[in-house]
Structures are given as structure tokens and as C-alpha cells.
């Protein structure tokens, strides 16, 4: 089954998933949204509002995170976890808040 993405381009499921992931990482300049490190090969997508807490796999609920940050955050509330980190940065917190949609921000 093909999946349509913007501009009418059709991709198979694997290609669509890869493109979806790459676009989010690219929009964040290939950097971890939390610690701002270069993602390199450790790129993951973190559900801002964890799936276990009702979060969806939607671009505005996903941010790139290095493997270390993603594992350490786990399903915790992102702001609470982020503010406890030595690398917390108000500018990055604002970027995350601007990225997530209002429904996600209210639920988090």
C-alpha cells in the first residue's frame, strides 16, 4: 500500500516513515531538542506527551532527542524532567513549547 505525502508524492510505508522522521529531525537542525547535542547516529524521536499518557504519534508531539535524553526522560512529563537537567536552557524550553500543538501543551 502506498502512502501519499505532500506534493502528491506516493511512498511505500517504510519510505513514508523514514521521510516523516527525517523531516522532524531536519526541522530541529539535527540537534537534540533537550540537550542540543548533535544527533549523529543516536537520533530518536521522543513523544513529548508519552504514548502511555495518551500522546499520539503526530509531528507536533514528536521532537528529536539523543538516545540518552530519550531513555532518561522515559514517560515523564517533559517540562518537569527537562528543568531537572544540568543542560536545561530556557531558550530550548521555549522552542519545544512553540513546536508542540496547544492540545499537547495543555495536556503536558
State where each predicted segment sits.
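A detector for short metal-coordination/catalytic motifs
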Residues: 60-61, 68-108
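Solvent-exposed, flexible loop/coil residues
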Residues: 5, 52-53, 82-86
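Histidine-centered nuclease catalytic patch
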Residues: 34-64, 76-80
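Generic anion/oxyanion-binding catalytic loop in active/binding sites
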Residues: 21, 51, 70
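Short, charged surface segments at domain edges that flank catalytic/cofactor-binding sites
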Residues: 1-31, 90, 97-104
